[in-house]
Each structure stands twice: as C-alpha cells, then as structure tokens.
C-alpha cells in the first residue's frame, strides 16, 4: 500500500544562511588578523634579559606606548597572587602568551597546560621551559582558544583566560570558549577571567 503524503516542508532562508557563512568567515579573518599581529610582535622578543618577564606587546591602549616595567611587575604579581590563592593543582591557561603567568604559577602546580594561537609564543615558552626545572611538567599547545581537543572533561581545577577575551571576534565565540572551558573544569573549580579591557 503506497500511502505517501506530504506532511511538512522547509524552505531554507538563503539570506540567513549567507549571513551565518559571512559571520563565520569574519570570525576566522579577525582571529587570523590578531594571530598575525601577535606573531609579528612576539618575533621581536629575542633581546630580553629576563625571559620570564617578557612584556613586549603590553602597550597602553590610549597612547600605544609600552607599559612601564614596574607597573607590569605589580600587575603580574597581583594576578598571580589571586590565582595562587585558590591553590591550583591542574591548570589550563588559554592564551599563555610569552609565559608571564605560566612561569610563576606552573611551579606551584601538578599539571599545567598552556595554549596560544601564536606559534612564536609557544616556541618562546617552550625554550623557557627547557631552561627551568620547575617548568618541565608544562604541556604546550599551539591552538586557538576554542580548541580543547584531547583534554579530559572535569580535569582542571583552574582555567585562566587573562588578557584574552577582548581579542575574541564576538560574543558567540566567547560563549563557545566558555562552554567548552566549563566542560573541562572540575565541579567547584575556578575560571579566572582577568585583564578585560573596558570599551565603555
């Protein structure tokens, strides 16, 4: 018995699909632009005396001038103190940059994963790790903030996003990163979002 009949049909909104595709392309382009900027900035890092305190690229948002070293030291110490006050053991730092926080927090932890989309930054931190026994347990990944591939769910007690989210292309990307981060965070763990620029 052939009892076929049409019960429903869908007409895709081609304009909405085009907008979504354009939005995804825009996201990719923006992330790519930031990556290029940081690759170029970080590649100027060879002449640094204290490789664990490389503040290249930390510039005043208004003047474009480099931030004074003493201000940066105070900011780093305060940030590290805040994070260490939670007594972290298994840490994921998304956007570890040149290791300002990593080099100070990782020695106090059992596990420390650092990710950054800049290969130059990851290579720089990898070289730093090779010179310090207290950092030998650090695992580095060259990847974008939304890539959590190979990381166990509910493994980390602390996830750090410091001076990172203002470079995300939009709120959807931020929400995607946060959703994935929460999956990797142990119940009762800490998500540290720091140094968020105020655009108001």
Predicted regions, residues:
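A short glycine-rich, Lys/Arg-flanked "PGG" loop and its adjoining helix->strand segment in the class I
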Residues: 175-190
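Conserved SAM-binding loop
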Residues: 125-126
């Amino acid at each position: 018995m052939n009892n076929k009949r049409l019960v429903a049909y869908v007409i895709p909104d081609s304009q909405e699909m085009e907008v979504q595709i354009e939005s995804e392309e825009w996201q990719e382009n923006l992330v790519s632009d930031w990556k290029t900027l940081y690759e170029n900035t970080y590649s100027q890092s060879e002449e640094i005396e204290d490789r664990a305190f490389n503040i290249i690229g930390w510039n005043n948002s208004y003047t474009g001038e480099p931030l004074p070293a003493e201000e940066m030291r105070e900011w780093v110490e305060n940030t590290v103190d805040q994070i260490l006050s939670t007594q972290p053991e298994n840490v994921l730092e998304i956007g570890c940059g040149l290791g300002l926080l990593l080099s100070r927090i990782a020695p106090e932890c059992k596990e420390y994963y650092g990710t950054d989309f800049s290969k130059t930054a990851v290579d720089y931190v990898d070289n730093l790790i090779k010179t310090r026994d207290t950092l030998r347990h650090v695992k580095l990944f060259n990847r974008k903030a939304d890539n959590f591939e190979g990381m166990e769910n509910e493994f980390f007690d602390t996830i750090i996003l410091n001076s990172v989210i203002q470079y995300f292309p939009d709120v959807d990307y931020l929400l995607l990163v946060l959703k994935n981060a929460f999956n990797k965070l142990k119940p009762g763990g800490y998500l540290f979002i720091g140094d968020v620029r105020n655009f108001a």
